[in-house]
């Protein structure tokens, strides 16, 4: 399967669309009027369910304009290939003012990413590297 399959759960739902030929993501829209409370979060309905192409998963990502102009971010959103429920976007308002979303507003973007799911092998040792166990800024800031 090479197509992104979309099922409209609500007649007024908007089909995900790319904003330009080179756009990485498909804009997804709200099917409801909601308020993202100041410094709060809410799961916003899109009125669609999807089936991603084989070998991929969907990632719900912020729209740069909403993030830059209004401080609206998107929290965790991984859409597994076997998930068939409604696609929702968890929006987080980083500002001190409520943000109003109207039905039909583009709220996030769906990015399809290839995924590798190798078998897990338990080993007694891992090979050494120059970095070793250094993390959290160990290679510089």
Curated annotation (Swiss-Prot):
What this protein needs as a cofactor is:
Mg(2+)
Specify the species.
Answer: Paramecium bursaria Chlorella virus 1 (PBCV-1)
The family annotation for this protein states: Belongs to the dUTPase family.
- Quote the function comment for this protein: This enzyme is involved in nucleotide metabolism: it produces dUMP, the immediate precursor of thymidine nucleotides and it decreases the intracellular concentration of dUTP so that uracil cannot be incorporated into DNA.
Coiled-coil spans are: none
The cross-references to Pfam families, in alphabetical order and at most eight, read:
dUTPase (PF00692)
Recorded catalytic reaction(s): these are: dUTP + H2O = dUMP + diphosphate + H(+)
Q: In which pathway does it act?
A: Pyrimidine metabolism; dUMP biosynthesis; dUMP from dCTP (dUTP route): step 2/2
* Record protein name field: Deoxyuridine 5'-triphosphate nucleotidohydrolase
E.C. number(s) listed in UniProt: 3.6.1.23
Q: Which UniProt keywords apply?
A: Hydrolase, Magnesium, Metal-binding, Nucleotide metabolism
């Amino acid at each position: 399967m090479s197509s992104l399959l979309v099922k409209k759960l609500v007649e007024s739902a908007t089909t995900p669309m790319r904003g330009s030929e080179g756009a990485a993501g498909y804009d997804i829209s709200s099917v409801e009027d909601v308020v993202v409370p100041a410094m709060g979060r809410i799961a916003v309905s899109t009125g669609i369910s999807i089936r991603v192409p084989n070998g991929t998963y969907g990632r719900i990502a912020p729209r740069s304009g909403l993030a830059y102009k209004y401080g609206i971010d998107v929290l965790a959103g991984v859409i597994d290939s076997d998930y068939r429920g409604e696609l929702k976007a968890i929006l987080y308002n980083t500002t001190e003012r409520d943000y109003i979303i109207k039905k039909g507003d583009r709220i996030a973007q769906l990015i399809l990413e290839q995924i590798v799911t190798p078998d897990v092998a338990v080993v007694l040792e891992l090979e050494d590297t120059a970095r070793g166990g250094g993390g959290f800024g160990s290679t510089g800031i």
